[in-house]
Amino acid sequence: MDNYYFSAKAYTTLVEAMPGKTFTDATALVNWQRGTKSAEELDFMRKAARISEKIIDGLLDRVEPGVPKNEIAASIYSDALRGVDDAWGDYPAIVPLLPSGTDAAAPHLTWDGRSFAEGEVTFFEVSGCYRRYHTPFCRTIFLGTPPDDLKRAEAALVEGLEAGLDAARAGNRAADIANALAAPLERAGIERGARCGYPIGISYPPDWGERTISLRPEDDSILKPGMTFHFMPGLWMDDWGIEITESILIRETGPAETFCHRPRKMFVK
């Protein structure tokens, strides 16, 4: 009974139209059933991943000091909708997120008319979309020379990301990914309280997450082959933020497969 597009009015209309009937709350029932993807769904997600890569490649070429952020947002949409080869692009469920400087201390911020500036960090959270299937992908760009604390955080984050990917195996728990990520961060003196991922697949606005399993220490859900997640260990600190993420597939054996294939690092220009 809890859904973006199932309103209180819709519920009362059903009750009035079907007197004497009992309605059972089946919130998220369908979401749980679609957690394991078919071969065709995975093919769609791999095509979406090629679009995600194209978007990030374009950002690495175009982002420079003095370029207005809205122009970069427009280029993201252009790459997303033009697609790659036979994978035409659809509109993603979430708009491009690209906060810079102190704005990057918080997730989920979009853009304005300001220009990119020397000495600022920007993370880009985007996703290609093919036949409504998504593969979110985040990378971070620093214009200039990054400070030492940001470089130390990058190193710990990448170490945690690699550890989490190795822990993302069939039979392990969602919590195992979160705990693997947390260990290098804790050694670096970084506390991170937020979840670090969620299931993905087919979606419409306003969200590309499936709202079921949550990659956090408290979630003991068992990982199964065919499950797909956005593993997104972002850091949002007092006056900066960094995101280096991967969309992943739980395989029959071995660690997770990443849908996208780009260096796991903060790009410096």
Describe the role of every protein-language-model region.
Residues M1-K269:
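Active-site neighborhoods and metal-handling regions in enzymes and metal-associated proteins
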